[in-house]
Every structure is written in structure tokens, then in C-alpha cells.
Amino acid sequence: VNASLVTPREVFAEALKYNAVSVVLLHNHPSGDAAPSHNDIAVTDRIVQAGKILGVQVIDHIIIGDNTYTSLKEKEYM
């Protein structure tokens, strides 16, 4: 598996269930490379926009690789 699709509906289901006001997204890259793909950035933007509509702030999206990570917030992708 080299890709996985996630929808805003899936992301925010638990957040809304517990009346959360913010979330942090986190996923791994089995390849070990923590660099965000174009799809990672596009999906993050979509989820951030959905969060604004729902009133749930997306604080960060962190990608885990081999002994490293990338914060999309730190890299200013969001």
C-alpha cells in the first residue's frame, strides 16, 4: 500500500462526538521518508477548510518516518 485516502468526515467524526475544539493530524509513511507528498498537502488543506466550517481547528499535521518526523505547520504548509 503506497496511499491511503482519508475524508474530512472520518477525521472529524470523533472530534465532533467529544465536542473537541481542535485536532492534531498524524500519520506515518511506511517508506520511512517523512517528507509530505503533494497529496498530503492537498488533503491537509481540505481538512483545515472543513475544520473551519465545523469550528474545529487543525493545529498541526505530523508525518512520521524512520526516526524522524515532519510538522506541516513548522514547514508552513498550513
Roles of regions detected by a PLM:
Residues 1-78:
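Active-site-proximal loop/helix of nucleotide/amide-processing enzymes and allied scaffolds
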